[in-house]
Amino acid sequence: MKQRNNAKRVRLEQTRRPKKNPLKAAGIEKVDYKDINTLRQFISDRHKIRSRRVTGLTPQQQREVATAVKNAREMALLPFTSR
């Protein structure tokens, strides 16, 4: 029984690696609502804004992305929903 728990713990530790920050990798410092291709990385197939846990962004970057997505939706650059 102990080996089983240890194996499970080892497997969890191996899978929990920090995600790469896509904005930092692309060299983007300020998120712009007009940059639709970048914003689409942070939207799910149901057009919901993805969480930090999924995207690997910092809290400040996540707020900037959320604001940019909302502005792009208001400007009709991104859809609110999918059909």
Curated annotation (Swiss-Prot):
GO biological process per UniProt: translation
Aminoacyl-tRNA synthetase among keywords: no
UniProt gene name: rpsR
GO CC entries: cytosolic small ribosomal subunit
Native organism: Corynebacterium glutamicum (strain ATCC 13032 / DSM 20300 / JCM 1318 / BCRC 11384 / CCUG 27702 / LMG 3730 / NBRC 12168 / NCIMB 10025 / NRRL B-2784 / 534)
One function term, GO molecular function aspect: small ribosomal subunit rRNA binding
Coiled coil region boundaries: none
Function: Binds as a heterodimer with protein bS6 to the central domain of the 16S rRNA, where it helps stabilize the platform of the 30S subunit.
Pfam families according to UniProt: Ribosomal_S18
Region Disordered, annotated ranges: 1-23
Top-level taxon: Bacteria
Entry protein name: Small ribosomal subunit protein bS18
Matches recorded under PANTHER family: 30S RIBOSOMAL PROTEIN S18, SMALL RIBOSOMAL SUBUNIT PROTEIN BS18M
PROSITE patterns the UniProt entry points to: RIBOSOMAL_S18
Assembly with partners or alone: Part of the 30S ribosomal subunit. Forms a tight heterodimer with protein bS6.
Keywords of this entry: Ribonucleoprotein, Ribosomal protein, RNA-binding, rRNA-binding
Family according to the record: Belongs to the bacterial ribosomal protein bS18 family.
